[in-house]
Amino acid sequence: MAQSPDGTGTAPVRITNSSTSVTSGIGVTQKLVGAAIAFGNVLRGTFGPNGLDKMLYKTNGEAAVTNDGAKIVAELLVKHPAAKAFVSLAESQENACGDGVTSCILLASELMSEAGRLLERGLHPLILVKGYEMALSQTLDELDSRSKPLGNNLEQVARTALVGRSTEGALDHLSKLCLLYTSDAADDSG
């Protein structure tokens, strides 16, 4: 049995490869925040009405051009734990809503960036989490207080959802069909 250099007991057992670097404390936080910011930067250029397409080279050698955040994230090969969390976040957003992946990732990236700044200034992580929870609660309350019934805007909502989905030639017809079927479904459900 190996003893520690001071003879007080067993020496620590090394469980990592000698070439593996081990980071702890603020170093881990900085790496996680840096990875979150980098992940957001991958999608930043595709965001908004002036967003640009990205050319992706897939592992099978094919190239794809898209500005769809979900498609871009699905093609990324990530190993970093923070990047894996962002891939999971993107998948959850896509599964729940079918859209909004880029916005979701950019928001999460900015929240992580701000969290990094606050942690560097000495804010305790539990206080940071509590603050984010309070901000979420206030945001949801504010959204509820400002929300209005859709009324006659449903057709415009359908048009907006269909834009960019290779439906431009039949946009008027499809948006009216969406309105008709959603109205029928609402009537059927009571």
Regions found by a protein language model. Name each.
Residues 184-190:
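A short, hydrophobic C-terminal helix/tail in secreted or cell-surface proteins
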Residues 1-183:
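N-terminal glycine-/lysine-enriched basic segments
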